[in-house]
Every structure is written in C-alpha cells, then in structure tokens.
Regions:
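Periplasmic-side early beta-strands and strand-to-turn transitions of outer-membrane beta-barrels
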Residues: 139, 155, 188-283
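Short, acidic, small-residue-rich periplasmic hinge/interaction motif at the N-terminus
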Residues: 22-60, 68, 135
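A beta-strand signature from Gram-negative outer-membrane beta-barrel systems
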Residues: 125-172
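Membrane-embedded beta-barrel scaffold of Gram-negative outer-membrane proteins
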Residues: 302, 306-318, 437-440, 466-526, ...
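C-terminal beta-signal and adjacent terminal beta-strands/loops
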Residues: 501-502, 544, 597-604, 620-669
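Gram-negative outer-membrane beta-barrel transporters
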Residues: 353, 391, 490-499, 518-602, ...
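Flexible loop and strand-edge segments within Gram-negative outer membrane beta-barrel domains
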Residues: 24, 230, 234-243, 253-305, ...
Length: 669
C-alpha cells in the first residue's frame, strides 16, 4: 500500500529545500521571452520515411498531460479512451491493432506480454522532450532487432540535461488543479556531476476523485428512448506516484544512459454503464518498475555499435466486488528481461549495413486457480542495409523472429519462426529537397499475448498468430522563409493499403480489465493520411501556427462471405477523423485552440443500426502568460476542455467528461 502522507511530505520537503537556496540565472528554453521569432524545421531530410513529431514546446501549448493525450494529434492513430483522469488509454495504428505498434521509452521498447496493451495514460509529459511517430518503422538501420518488426513505432524521448555556462543544475516545478478534484504535482531536478556526466530526477503525484457529470441516453432497436438521464460518474478515483532517475554520460564518439523508473497507482474502474447500472465495484493496483541501460559508440568513421539491457517487473492486482457478478480478487506478476546489440558498418560513404540481435524473456504468474504460468523466450535477428545518394535513398531489412512458450508443467506451446522483410525508398525530384516522394512495402507479425492464449476464463489457445502486409505511397513538401509573412509550410500525405491475416481483436466485456479474444480472419484496410502546417508572422512579435490532420480509413472484415458482417467496417474504426490546432503567440501570451473529430463508426462486427455510434467532436481552449520574478520564470495556464460540453463515448458505455477546467502553474529556476 502506498504511504500517501509520506510521499506528499517528501515532495514538500524537496520543494522547501530548493526554494531556500539562492539560485543563479535560469536558461530553460521553453519559458524565456524571445525577442526574435526563429522557425526551425522538424522534418529531417535524412529520413527515408518522414515522421510526425511533437516537441516539448508544442506539447506545452497543447496542454496535453499524458503521452496518450498528445498522440490524439497524429494522423493514422486511433485512441481507445475509457474516460476520466484514471481511465485506461491505448492506441491503435492504421486499424491494425495496438499490438502492431511498438512504443519505445528513451530508445528501449516498453513491453506487456500479458495483454500487449501499454496504458499510455501512465506516462506523464512533464519530463518528455519529444514524441515521434513512424509508420512502418524508424528510418534508421542502427536500432534493436525487434524494432524492425513493428507496423509502426512511437519513440518517447525524455529531457536530456542542458546547462548554461557556469550553471550546475536546473529545477522545474509544475502544479495543476482541475475538474474531478484533480491535482497533479511534478518536479524535475537536473544536476551536473562532471564535464561528462549529469543526472536528472523526476517525480510526480496525481490524485483525483474522477467524478464528472455525463448524459446517458440509449434507444431501443425500434428507435424509442430506453434511457435518458444525467448522472455522475462514480468509482473513477485515482492515486498515482511516478518517479524516474537518470544518469547521462558522454564518451569519445558516443554516450551512455542509465534509467530507474517506478509507477505505483490505485484506481477505481467505473466500468461500462449497462442496464442503467452506474457504479461497479472494480479496483486496480499497479506497481511497475523497470531499469534500463543504453550504450552507443562509434569506432572511426565506419563502425558504430549499440547495446541495450532492461529488466522490468509489473505487479497488478484486480478486484471486482460487484454483487451481481462472481467475486474476483486476482494478482498478476509479470517479469521481462531484455538484451539487444546492434551494429552498423559503413561499406562506402553512401552505403551501410547493420546486424542486430535481441533476446527477450517474459514470465507471467497469477494466483488464479490452474494458471499455467507461461514463459516466453524470443530471439530476433535483423539484417539491414541503406543506400543514401544525394536525391535517392533506399533501405531494406529482413527480421527473423523465433518464439517458444513454456508452461509450468514443463510442456512447450506455440513455437514458431517467422521472417518479415521490408523495403523503403525516398526520391527528391528537385535539388532543393523541398519535395520528396516515398514508398514502402513491409510484412509485420505478432504473436498472441499471454492473455490471448492462456487467460483462465477467456483465453483462446486456438488463436493463430497475426500478420500484416503494408503498402504505402506518399509525398512531403516543406518550405521555409527567413523573413516576411510566411515562415514555414509543410504538407504530407500518404495513401496506404494494409492486409491483416488472422486478426486478433480485443473487445471490452463489461469489465475494463478483461477482454474477449477472437480471430477475425482477414481484414483489408485502405486509408489516406493528410497533414499540413503553416506558420505566419503578421506583425513583429506575433507568431501564428495552424496545423490540420485528416485520416480516412476503410477497414473491412473479408473473412467469410457467409458471415452477416462480411465486408462490414470493423469495430471502433471511423471512416473519417481529424484534428485542427491553432496557436497564437504574442509577446508573453500564448493562446491555443484544438479540435478533435471522430466520424461515424460501429461498436460491433455487424454494421447495423443498433451498433451505430454517432460522430463526436471536442474543442479545447487554453491561455497562458509567461513572466519572471528576478531570475525565476513562471508560466500560468488556464484551460477549458470540451468547450461545448458535448456528450460522447469513445468506447460504448464509457461516457467521457463534459465541459471541464484546469489551472496550471509552471516554475523554472
């Protein structure tokens, strides 16, 4: 059990000690007043496949508070949000499923062999410097072997300490209070230990009652109203503590980094609202820990090596005291051991090749009766090559994946070997490289998770592995101007086709922690992603940036012509979705407006009227003011979310909050 009083006292003492010191001038980059507007491109021409990126300053302007909040603004991403501060939040890329998306935290993949679902609501943005999304895979051949196997990848990079001349430390505090009795406090301390080594410590406390008003309205199959009332969402409280420590080191032609991370929480799970039942007795405790190390060094101009190691331990307790259901009180303990080595050799100045090997071991224990305690041994070997000409770039790779599961009775199950190739190409038609045309084809693969296969009540040992074929053609145009009205313009569009075989889909089954698993067989996905951004400076000191993102997806179940849902859109995938962001920066003021839209969709396999879900949209506003008192920089932000108080569900029967408010104070020393 978390000692709440001790943690709060510890953070308070830390703050009091810091404020008692006489501190020199601060040079934190995102809160200083800037007299001259400087625009720099975020799109790296070295990338074969351009990425989508949000950096720390942009994340601050969005008033996103978790990684999940930020990912809503990427094209091709669908977010599953169960509502409220503590609701589980997972992401899906291009309708292929969460398990095809790799998520790396400071260069090391986050794992969950139990159900494959990474709850991105657990990861705060207060220490995050950049989030990058790659479709296909990261445009680099020096990467862990398993990274070559994903259909898409998200890379979360935390802040690296940077110190001004003569300064040995940086301090940051952030406090936010908002609707649902939400209070979030975080602190970051960066310390220079030597000319080559620095440390950083980040800690955060989050608490909320999770209560918010919502409207519940449901119709019968004949169209008459079954329920129409306003109620308060209950049992959505959360208490969470996150702490992270890092050591950063620089060596000759390389670097190293060591990380300790812990996340502990207790939360209520409000559950689905079914048959006019508003409150359920579900609760969940998470105690997650991991430690990881990363080392990279170049030897001369030709050879570079990288090594990664990680150990993770996840302890989850799930309790359901709902009197209408079977009493449940189970604990799940998951361990992961991971090692990776990757090496790249420059055969010629324009031609390089890499070889990578990963080993991963996972084990799941539970106090459930007759639980089989599965262990998974996975080996990954990747061979890749890249050719980089002045106006043409191409990369190719092949990944061999070898997986074997062992159960507690000593038997082996679900052994397999799979080869997944990929090829990426990019052409710059003009010498300016403002316009690029790219294409890729890739095969990806994923094993069923432990829950898919072995969960005592709903596991399906007959599940087949899931594979996907991806084809993508796109173009990107970037233009910058050093002066004048227009400063930066970006346009990026992709047309893609994905074919998923033996697709595994997880549906919420009344309880948020449990799933119903099945193979759909085959799904064909056709889509278009469009993203554009424009920055203008109408008058001196006034910076206006607009960003639009649109996604069209047609994802059809084509398994069996005899099925009633043959060629129907798969659940929870809207045909049309998009976001719009407008940011206005003038002197010490920042105004931000963001709009999110998700079109019509269905919540079950059959596309019938009863399963139809209407489109939803939300508008969020924020206004912030920056100022300084002596050498301490402050930023105060007020925000209004869901301005028009729309009633909507992202997941059926999980109502989202109506209009809600927040007030944030940032202090940087």
């Amino acid at each position: 059990m978390i000692n709440k009083a001790a943690i709060v006292l510890l953070l308070w003492l830390m703050c009091s000690t810091v404020w008692a010191q006489q501190l020199p001038r601060s040079r934190f980059d995102s809160i200083q007043q800037v007299d001259e507007v400087i625009i720099s491109s975020r799109y790296n021409h070295k990338e074969v496949i351009p990425s989508q990126t949000l950096n720390g300053e942009q994340l601050e302007k969005l008033n996103a508070h978790s990684v999940a909040d930020a990912l809503r603004y990427f094209s091709g991403i669908q977010l599953k949000d169960y509502g409220g501060v503590g609701g589980i939040k997972t992401v899906n890329i291009r309708s292929m499923g969460t398990n095809h998306l790799g998520i790396s935290y400071d260069g090391v993949e986050l794992g969950n062999a139990q159900n494959g679902q990474i709850d991105l609501g657990q990861f705060s943005l207060d220490n995050v410097e950049e989030i990058t999304l790659f479709n296909g895979q990261k445009s680099a051949i020096l990467q862990p072997a398993s990274d070559f196997g994903h259909a898409g990848a998200i890379y979360i990079r935390t802040r690296a300490p940077r110190f001004s001349d003569g300064k040995g430390y940086n301090l940051k505090f952030k406090a936010r209070y908002g609707s649902s009795d939400m209070f979030r406090f975080s602190t970051l301390w960066e310390q220079r230990l030597s000319s080559k080594v620095s440390s950083s410590v980040s800690a955060e406390v989050l608490t909320a009652s999770g209560k918010y008003k919502f409207r519940y309205r449901r119709k019968k199959q004949d169209g008459t109203v079954a329920y129409d009332t306003t109620a308060i969402r209950e049992n959505g409280d959360i208490w969470a503590v996150r702490a992270e420590g890092n050591l950063h080191g620089m060596i000759s032609d390389g670097f190293w980094k060591f990380k300790l991370y812990t996340y502990n929480s207790e939360r209520g799970i409000p559950g689905a609202i079914v048959n006019n039942v508003w409150r359920r007795g579900e609760r969940q405790w998470d105690h997650n820990y991991f430690t990881q190390a990363r080392f990279q060094k170049s030897f001369g101009e030709r050879f570079t090596t990288q090594a990664v190691a990680k150990y993770a331990y996840y302890n989850t307790r799930y309790v359901n005291r709902d009197t209408t259901l079977l009493n449940v009180d189970n604990t799940y303990k998951q361990q992961e051991l991971y090692f990776s080595t990757s090496n790249v050799y420059n055969l010629l100045p324009i031609w390089s090749a890499s070889l990578s090997y990963d080993f991963k071991w996972n084990r799941l224990d539970s106090d459930m009766r007759q639980f089989v305690t599965p262990q998974r041994y996975a080996h990954y070997v990747a061979l890749a090559s890249a050719l980089n000409l002045e106006r043409f770039k191409i990369q190719a790779s092949v990944l061999a994946t070898m997986v074997k599961d062992r159960l507690n009775d000593g038997t082996s199950s679900k052994s397999m070997t799979e080869y997944t190739p990929a090829v990426f190409a990019n052409v710059y038609p003009f010498a300016s490289k403002e316009l690029s045309i790219r294409a890729y084809a890739k095969k990806s693969f994923r094993m069923p998770t432990f829950n898919d296969l072995y969960y005592t009540e709903i596991g399906n040992a007959l599940l087949k592995p899931e594979s996907a074929l991806q084809y993508n053609v796109g173009l990107s145009y970037d233009r910058q101007w050093p002066s004048g009205l227009f400063r930066f313009f970006h346009l990026q569009t992709d047309v893609y086709y994905n074919s998923v075989h033996d697709k595994i889909v997880a549906y919420p089954k009344g309880q948020q922690f449990r799933w119903t698993m099945l193979n759909l067989g085959r799904v064909h996905i056709k889509g278009i992603d469009v993203e554009t951004e424009l920055t203008v400076v109408p008058v001196s000191g006034l910076l206006v940036t607009g960003r639009l993102q649109y996604t069209y997806q047609d994802a059809r179940d084509v398994t069996d012509p005899e099925d009633t849902f043959y060629r129907d859109q798969i659940p929870y995938i809207p045909w049309h979705s998009g976001t719009a962001i407008l940011n206005i920066q003038y002197k010490k003021w920042d105004f931000n407006y963001s709009f999110i839209y998700a079109g019509e969709r269905y919540n079950q396999q059959e596309n019938i009227k009863y399963n139809y879900m209407q489109p939803w949209y939300t508008s969020d506003l924020s206004l912030s003011y920056r100022f300084k008192i002596k050498e301490t920089a402050f930023r105060i932000t007020g925000e209004v979310n869901n301005v028009f108080s729309q009633d909507y569900d992202v997941i059926l029967n999980y109502p989202m909050p109506k209009r809600n408010y927040g007030l944030t104070l940032d202090v940087k020393i």
